[in-house]
Amino acid sequence: MANDENTDGVNKSEKMEKMCEFIRPMVQNNPDGWGPCELPDQFKDIPYQPFSKSDRLGKISDWTGTAYQDKKFQNKYNSQFGGSGMKAYAYEHDEDETTFHLVDTTRVQKPPYQRGRFGQRNQRMRGRGGQRGGMSQMQALGKLKIHERDRRGQNKRWTRRNQAPIKMRDASVTVRPDWVTIEEMDFPRLSKLTLPGVKEGEDVLCCGAVEYYDKSYDRVNVKNEKPLQRIDRIFHTVTTTDDPVIRKLSKTEGNVYATDAILATIMCCTRSNYSWDIVIEKIGNKLFFDKRDNTEFDLLTVNETSVEPPQDDGNSLNSPRNLALEATFINHNFSQQVLKSNEPRYKFDEPNPFISEEEEGEVASVAYRYRKWDLNNGITLIARCEHDAVMQGPNNETQFLTIKALNEWDSKLANGVEWRRKLDTQRGAVLANELRNNACKLAKWTVQALLAGSDQLKFGYVSRASVRDSSKHVILETQQYKPNEFATQINLNMDNAWGILRCIIDICMNQKDGKYLIMKDPNKPMIRLYDIPDNTFESEGEEEDSDEEEQVKDAFQR
């Protein structure tokens, strides 16, 4: 038994020795670095990405990463162990989204007074730079250039962003295919023309009767306003060729014929923005400047030269056409209300040539003065001019007046000043604003007063009683100027005005006999001269909308 136990113990020890036998592993010596010299077969052709366990992985994989990274930030988030291979998987710290709040992204329009704030900042930078060394001055100068460049760019963007959308205006008359363009005259060239030395016009014939001006209206002010009344009188707007006096004078006097309104439109054309047209007939060596009947030529524009002229639709209360009808209605009623209607009129030698026996109603107070001007080189101009009233001067002399009315429709929409707040204290600011918004209309009124030889040009300030009602108005104040002084104040150069007229006359005189048309381009600063067929506009009355004609007629007969 003892032998058997010894034998079993030997066998167990042998088994234990076999189980605990140490097998020496294959050790590869890599003198050039760490790791095996050869890759096992199972690990061949597997892409290897070096990494470090301490690196913070931002993504599992990036299929949209760029092939080339920005060298400026190559060591910002990459591990020193991983090298450039971790660039695609580099962890980047994002802002904590728990502090995220929705904010109002609406752009706030900067007021105009903030435009110069960059200039003030530049001045402070310039002051600091002057106290430092040369390098600081160079840095400040560079910053000044950057701020100046940014300021210009921001001003340009501000201007484009805040400009009103440009609305294409319609032409006063449709250009037909059979019209031939003879000349295009742009405003910059016309502004350089001059005809100095034109003397005061000579009276050829005076006719009509006018009433005396009521000086009590000079005391009207904002606190003592007067309502504008409706005066039912007849106004005649006769064109040149329909004037019996001009027809008679054309046989013996002059070779160019027109009315003061037509001449003022041509002479002040460089200030106009809206489209207008004038018909010219050349018969032999004579020119007749005409307007088309029952058109908007005689309507007064409103805010034509404003930065943002009225652009409402045709049915709107403040559309350009409705505002023009309102302004014409105001002018006619104001020019008759401020007169002494109960006193005898001042009469010229000849009666009003346009009164017919068929007309019913009272004719408006108006006197016509037919005058003659010598424009040199054989050009003699005959024009019909108008006076609205007379009054006694300081020395009891008779002074002739041209009476016009400026109207306020909506100061907020017109980018203007509120008359009821400014007229009594800052009348000059109100007039300056009107000169900006209605430069063409005021210039034409001044030219008409100068052509007629009026002694005074009287303005009335008429405003709506309610902003939303264009039928009721009140007179807030009156003001008068001498035409020559007012022309200087509004920078009206009569030598240039005569030069423009003479240029157009010379071009037309060189054409063959026929009918021509001058039209202001509705969207460009230029006028064009067309050669049109002789029968043009003869059947126009049947083609045009009768409703529009009735509106224009009603504006002159109310």
UniProtKB/Swiss-Prot annotation:
Q: Indicate where this protein resides in the cell.
A: Cytoplasm
Q: Indicate whether Magnesium appears among the record's keywords.
A: no
Q: Superkingdom of the source?
A: Eukaryota
Chain spans, region RNA gate: 296-310
Q: Which GO terms describe its cellular component?
A: eukaryotic 43S preinitiation complex; eukaryotic 48S preinitiation complex; eukaryotic translation initiation factor 3 complex
**GO MF annotations in UniProt:** mRNA cap binding; translation initiation factor activity
Kindly give the InterPro entries that the UniProt entry links to this protein: eIF3d (IPR007783)
Q: Keyword Kinase: yes or no? A: no
UniProt entry keywords in alphabetical sequence: Cytoplasm, Initiation factor, Protein biosynthesis, RNA-binding
User: Where is composition skewed (Acidic residues) in this entry?
Assistant: 537-551
Please list where the region (Disordered) is annotated. 534-558
A Gene Ontology BP annotation from the UniProt entry:
cap-dependent translational initiation
Comment block on domains: The RNA gate region regulates mRNA cap recognition to prevent promiscuous mRNA-binding before assembly of eif3d into the full eukaryotic translation initiation factor 3 (eIF-3) complex.
> What subunit structure does UniProt give?
Component of the eukaryotic translation initiation factor 3 (eIF-3) complex.
The name on file for this protein is Eukaryotic translation initiation factor 3 subunit D
Q: Which organism is it from?
A: Nasonia vitripennis (Parasitic wasp)
